[in-house]
Amino acid sequence: MWVARDAKVYPTAYLGAPCIIGHKTEVRPGAFIRGNALVGDNCVVGNSTELKNVILFDNVQVPHYNYVGDSILGYKSHMGAGSITSNVKSDKLPVVIHNEGEEIETGRKKVGAMLGDYVEVGCNSVLNPGTVIGRDASVYPTSCVRGVVPERCKGNIAVKK
């Protein structure tokens, strides 16, 4: 485990190994980092947020009540309160990424979401297993997203910015 000297980790946060916490990152009270986590510089891992098998690029914010598992969050991406990355299908079969009629077999039972840089996920949204969201896209609050969301889209694949 490695935590940058200028990172702030509150006493009630849990850090499991292996884990790297970058410079000026804040791990707030009640955060639960289960391990296999690479958290970049200037990130916020907030109250009651759980991370597992993740890469958070610099300036990512998962500030309140988020679950991020088996996922990659790009530079300056933000997940609103209560939004989660679901990483296991309800039928427990391997995750397939759906992209405009193409099905990409992952061969893995646990795959969360992959967010490009500058992605905004609205409050209480669910990103289903294998969701890919392109750079500078926005997901509306309370959305349930599946498949590939192109870059610079708003909503649930619907409206271009």
What does each model-identified segment do?
Residues 22-23, 40-41, 52, 69:
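The repeat-register position in solenoid repeat domains
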Residues 47-48, 53-161:
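Glycine-rich hexapeptide-repeat left-handed beta-helix
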Residues 2, 20, 38, 114, ...:
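ABC ATPase A-loop
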Residues 25-29, 40-46, 106:
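Active-site-adjacent structural elements in folded domains
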